[in-house]
């Protein structure tokens, strides 16, 4: 198997080929093509939720946030194409919506300029929840008089 098989399987949602790759050599899921795109980039760009769900458990945070030669992450592609469910999966796996590409555009920006409202709502909810978690610790400290 080579990286082209992985890219094809993820771009075309060929789950049979993807299962074969996972069974024979799951470490291949981290590989990237000559443009820096991974299978996760392809599946995210094309809205293949089942593929993203299948491969995320094999990927670490570094791979989930990997940038291609244009600086785009899988989150950039999912956001600009309006794939909110994929953005949610990426966020839950440690994806960072603030990473900027070489044009200084983040996934949040890409979703906003393309009027991807579901994605924007998801990012807003994520930021609010993240802020709440951070503030909860501060509130407890305040209550304890620290």
Curated annotation (Swiss-Prot):
ANK repeats, residue ranges: 1-31, 35-64, 70-99, 103-132
Domain of life: Eukaryota
Taxonomic classification: Eukaryota, Fungi, Dikarya, Ascomycota, Taphrinomycotina
Subcellular location: Cytoplasm; Nucleus
Keywords linked to the UniProt accession: ANK repeat, Cytoplasm, Nucleus, Repeat
KW DNA-binding (keyword) present: no
GO cellular component: cytosol; nucleus; preribosome, small subunit precursor
Designated name of the protein: Ankyrin repeat-containing protein P16F5.05c
Presence of keyword Membrane: no
Major subcellular location class: cytoplasm
TM region positions: none
GO biological process: ribosome biogenesis
């Amino acid at each position: 198997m080579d990286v082209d098989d992985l890219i094809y399987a993820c771009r075309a949602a060929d789950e049979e080929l993807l299962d074969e790759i996972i069974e024979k050599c799951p470490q291949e899921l981290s590989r990237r093509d000559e443009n820096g795109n991974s299978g996760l980039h392809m599946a995210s760009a094309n809205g293949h939720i089942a593929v993203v769900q299948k491969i995320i458990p094999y990927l670490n945070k570094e791979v989930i946030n990997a940038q291609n030669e244009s600086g785009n992450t899988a989150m950039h592609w999912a956001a600009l194409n309006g794939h909110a469910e994929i953005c949610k999966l990426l966020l839950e796996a440690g994806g960072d919506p603030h990473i900027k590409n070489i044009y200084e555009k983040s996934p949040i920006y890409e979703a906003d300029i393309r009027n991807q409202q579901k994605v924007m709502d998801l990012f807003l909810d994520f930021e609010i929840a993240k802020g709440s978690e951070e503030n909860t610790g501060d509130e407890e400290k305040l209550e304890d008089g620290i």
